[in-house]
């Protein structure tokens, strides 16, 4: 799958969430989400900020690095960098915030148009290949969209765009351990998932004795830490597979724990 396909799927995922957000009530924007201290509006603000940050990282890496340094300096002074990110958006009304997110998406779409497979993009931490970079953005909009859906009490029709997130979840297995300062477990684990369209997706060596199997949706919910493993129908066999699913983290940033069982 080439970069253009991932970019197109990212845009489709953003538009799918836009259609949901466009239909909610004004009061829904103020609902609390699973992220402590974050409302539905804050989830959209987060996406808007980082879509623009991603566009800046592509178009002007040096300027992006300067912005990262400013955030790090805020953290080192004990200041709330997260609040600084969200504050400008918290003054906006829902309609204005929605337009701000749309502007950020357009900005990212334009800046990413000419990315090729051999391009790398600077980011928070190591640089990323362009395909992985856009896949991470797709994962973010899907995961934060899930937070919004859970808060409002809605469900969405899942698509095979989940393949991007499932693959990201699989390849970040070692990262999930290393990010916690733990040694990665080398025991092979195969992942067998049923896609929304009914296809079977397989990751990892077929001869592996340990496995994770079930719906692609459940797997994606676990690796993005939107559901506890116990709240899914995933079948996990083997100690290495179990340990992975306990701490799976497909996204960058400090190590975090998934939700408690519902």
Predicted regions and their residues:
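C-terminal interaction segments
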Residues: 207-262
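Glycine/small-residue-rich hydrophobic helix-like segments
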Residues: 180-223
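An N-terminal domain-cap segment
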Residues: 1-45, 54
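Short, helix-capping/interhelical loops that line the mouth of catalytic, cofactor-
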Residues: 1-5, 52-109, 113, 161
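Structural signal for well-ordered, non-membrane alpha-helices
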Residues: 14, 18, 22, 51-55, ...
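Acidic interhelical loop/turn segments
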Residues: 21-33, 105-133
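Hydrophobic packing residues in well-ordered alpha-helices of helical domains and bundles
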Residues: 7-10, 40, 98-101, 134-137
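Short, contiguous alpha-helical
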Residues: 30-73, 123-179, 219
């Amino acid at each position: 799958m080439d970069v253009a396909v991932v970019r197109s799927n990212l845009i489709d995922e953003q538009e799918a969430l836009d259609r949901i957000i466009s239909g909610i009530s004004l009061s829904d924007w103020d609902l609390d989400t699973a992220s402590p201290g974050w409302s539905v509006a804050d989830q959209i603000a987060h996406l808007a900020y980082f879509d623009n940050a991603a566009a800046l990282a592509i178009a002007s890496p040096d300027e992006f690095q300067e912005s990262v340094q400013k955030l790090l300096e805020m953290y080192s002074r004990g200041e709330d960098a997260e609040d600084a990110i969200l504050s400008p958006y918290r003054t906006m009304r829902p309609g204005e915030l929605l337009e701000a997110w749309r502007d950020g998406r357009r900005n990212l779409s334009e800046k990413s148009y000419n990315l090729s497979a051999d391009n790398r993009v600077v980011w928070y931490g190591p640089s990323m290949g362009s395909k992985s970079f856009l896949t991470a953005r797709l994962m973010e909009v899907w995961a934060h969209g899930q937070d919004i859906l859970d808060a409002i009490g809605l469900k969405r029709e899942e698509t095979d765009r989940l393949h991007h997130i499932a693959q990201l979840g699989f390849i970040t297995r070692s990262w999930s351990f290393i990010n916690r300062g733990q040694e990665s477990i080398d025991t092979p684990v195969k992942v067998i998932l049923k896609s929304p369209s009914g296809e079977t997706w397989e990751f990892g060596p077929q001869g592996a004795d340990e496995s994770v199997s079930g719906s692609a949706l459940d797997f994606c919910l676990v690796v993005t830490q939107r559901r506890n493993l116990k709240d899914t129908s995933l079948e996990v066999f083997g100690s290495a597979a179990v340990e992975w699913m306990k701490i799976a983290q497909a996204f960058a940033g400090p190590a975090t724990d998934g939700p408690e069982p519902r």
